[in-house]
From Swiss-Prot:
Reaction(s) catalysed by this chain's protein: GTP + AH2 + S-adenosyl-L-methionine = (8S)-3',8-cyclo-7,8-dihydroguanosine 5'-triphosphate + 5'-deoxyadenosine + L-methionine + A + H(+)
GO molecular function annotations of the record: 4 iron, 4 sulfur cluster binding; cyclic pyranopterin monophosphate synthase activity; GTP 3',8'-cyclase activity; GTP binding; metal ion binding; S-adenosyl-L-methionine binding
Radical SAM core domain: residues covered: 8-227
Organism: Staphylococcus aureus (strain NCTC 8325 / PS 47)
Record: residues binding S-adenosyl-L-methionine: Y30, G75, S126, M197
Residues noted as binding GTP in the record, renumbered to the chain: R17, R71, T102, K163, R266, A267, R268
Complex and partners: Monomer and homodimer.
Name recorded for this polypeptide: GTP 3',8-cyclase
Variant or mutagenesis effect after changing G340 to A/S/V: Loss of activity
Protein encoded by which gene: moaA
Binding site for [4Fe-4S] cluster 1: C24, C28, C31
Keywords: 4Fe-4S, GTP-binding, Iron, Iron-sulfur, Lyase, Metal-binding, Molybdenum cofactor biosynthesis, Nucleotide-binding, S-adenosyl-L-methionine
EC number, as in UniProt: 4.1.99.22
């Protein structure tokens, strides 16, 4: 039987973000800048990661508390060996209605079919430019946008439902909004543009680098005829629009200009096995990995997850100002540990 629990702000729990690795094969400046994550950077050893059995156990207990959706993140999740084994385990859990995965797309041809066969049906591909030269400068690994576009074509050809995520930074890739909308509109693929956020500690974020939803919308309306779309469910983070001529939808994620803390239903598990109630968390998360490995029962695990959710009062984006960002003393958890 599913228990209905809410946090201190009355928010239910519906989603679980599972980071399966802290490693990535890109070095995007806003997430894992090469100056910080160089060739000598020490990533987590395997024994510091949750095993797939541990993740499945955690997901099963969370399903009993109301979680219906699971998203697999990283780092780059396709760098975790035998990820299809985890997908198959998660697909067997009663109550889990949707399993998604966020990826940079580079390894889709290598692993996509195995993941599909294990039950994965939905992926988000992070792609911040459609121009090859610009994309190479963003990922710092000399990977062309055309390479990722080919991987996306492959993913759709095997039956995966693909959405594309684009983090927009002023003066960096805001000139990519129109060409990317045009390209994916013709492909009938949903694209979502995300306001640049101050996740982690190393991306040099400030308000001047943010292109807001309203600024994006003004740009888009000069080139396309669009209509707004009603939200599909409670807690949907994107504001959706529809192209009038072919009905293809796109989204704008207002993580800075119009925060959505009040409807956030996500629990997050970092790659080193810690619980976080917010993408912008500063306090060290509860060590779920150590708790599980101490020999607790599923009932004890459930009670701990309930307690963690019921004391949750995070609303970082609601409270974000230039002053709060400048005065912040404690470091946030880095994005490669907690996913997006």
């Amino acid at each position: 039987m599913v228990e209905q629990i809410k946090d201190k702000l009355g928010r239910p729990i519906r989603d679980l973000r599972l980071s399966v690795t802290d490693r990535c094969n890109f070095r995007c400046d806003y997430c894992m800048p090469k100056e910080v994550f160089g060739d000598d950077f020490v990533f987590l050893p395997k024994n510091e990661l949750l095993t797939f059995d541990e993740m499945a156990r955690i997901a099963k207990v969370y399903a009993e508390l109301g979680v219906k959706k699971i998203r697999i993140t990283g780092g780059e999740p396709l760098m975790r060996r035998d990820l299809d084994v985890l997908i198959a385990k998660l697909n067997q859990i009663d109550g889990i209605e949707d399993i998604g995965l966020t990826t940079n797309g580079l390894l889709l041809k290598k692993h996509g079919q195995k993941l599909y066969d294990a039950g994965l049906r939905r992926i988000n591909v992070s792609l911040d430019a459609i121009d090859d030269t610009l994309f190479q400068s963003i990922n710092n690994r000399n990977i062309k946008a055309t390479t990722i576009l080919e991987q996306i074509d492959y993913a759709t050809s095997i039956g995966l439902n693909v959405k594309v995520n684009v983090v927009i930074q002023k003066g960096i890739n805001d000139d990519q909004i129109i060409p990317m909308l045009e390209y994916f509109k013709d492909k009938h693929i949903e694209i979502r543009f995300i306001e640049f956020m101050d996740v982690g500690n190393d991306n040099g974020w400030d308000f001047s680098k943010v292109v807001t939803k309203d600024e994006m919308l003004t740009m888009i309306e000069q080139h396309f005829e669009i209509d707004p779309v009603e939200p599909k469910y409670f807690g949907e983070v994107a504001k959706y629009y529809r192209h009038k001529d072919n009905g293809v939808q796109f989204g704008l994620i207002t993580s800075v200009s119009q925060s959505f803390c009040s409807t956030c239903t996500r629990a997050r598990l970092s790659s080193d096995g810690k619980f976080y109630g917010c993408l912008f968390a500063t306090v060290d998360g509860f060590n779920v990995k150590a708790f599980i490995r101490s020999g607790v029962t599923d009932e004890e695990l459930k009670e701990q997850f309930k307690a963690l959710w019921q004391i949750r009062d995070d609303r970082y984006s609601d409270e974000r100002t230039a002053q709060t960002v400048a005065n912040r003393q404690r470091k946030k958890i880095n994005m490669n540990y907690i996913g997006g």
